[in-house]
A protein has these predicted regions:
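Non-heme di-metal
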Residues: 2-221
Length: 221
């Protein structure tokens, strides 16, 4: 059965429902103009519209947040001289990353690179156009003006992130990641070999790594 993916513009929740079902955000109950279609999915989420789908999203969010927290905790432990504790925080963070990946894959959220770039761009767009704009207004209303400015500052960063993802997506679609219309300086990300041309070599002549390791050199110093 085909399903449709939606984004709640009020709380940021994404969810899927069988095609033809009236969308209602399972988290905040928003409907109508507050719900945005993200993309149609060819039955890649067998849990669409169920409580289990909500539970999977909750589990994914919890594991993702735990991973970040443990990474921050590791930095504190390292600064305080607890190398072993720092390493264990990082090890556990990697465990949590894999747990989150399990639930993310169950939800059918992993696509190919072009699909992932589009999903990333849409997520960044929501953050800078809706989420941070709204939370900044609330912070101002409640007197937290410094925090409101931080929200707006991060929103500008998210805008740049969206632009970057869309530029990369255009390159992928145009098959212009490793070939350009103009002569470029290419650098091997593995060994640092430099070459000049409109196209990156199929393999690095120095370390034999494949073309996928090449990028346009962008030194700015």
């Amino acid at each position: 059965m085909k399903s449709v993916k939606y984004l709640c513009k009020l709380c940021g929740q994404t969810f899927e429902l069988p095609e033809g079902t009236e969308p209602v955000c399972p988290i905040c109950g928003a409907t109508g103009e507050h719900i945005q279609v993200v993309k149609a999915a060819e039955g890649n989420n067998k849990y669409a519209g169920t409580r289990t789908e909500e539970n999977l999203r909750t589990a994914f969010a919890g594991e993702s947040q735990a991973r970040n927290k443990y990474t921050y905790f590791a930095s504190v432990a390292k600064k305080e001289g607890y190398e072993q504790i720092s390493a264990l925080f990082l090890k556990t963070a990697e465990n949590e990353k894999e747990h989150a990946k399990l639930w993310f894959k169950e939800l059918g959220e992993l696509g190919n690179t072009a699909e992932n770039l589009l999903a990333a761009a849409e997520g960044e767009n929501y953050e800078w156009t809706d989420m941070y704009d709204e939370v900044a207004k609330v912070a101002d209303e409640e007197g937290f003006h410094d925090l409101a400015e931080k929200f707006r500052g991060v929103a500008l960063i998210e805008k740049h992130h969206e632009e970057r993802y869309r530029a990369l997506l255009n390159n992928v679609k145009a098959k212009a990641v490793f070939e350009k219309s103009e002569v470029k300086v290419w650098e091997c990300r593995n060994c640092g070999h430099i070459c000049v041309g409109t196209k990156a070599p199929e393999t690095c002549p120095v370390c034999n790594h494949p073309q996928s390791y090449f990028e346009v050199n962008c030194e700015n110093y």
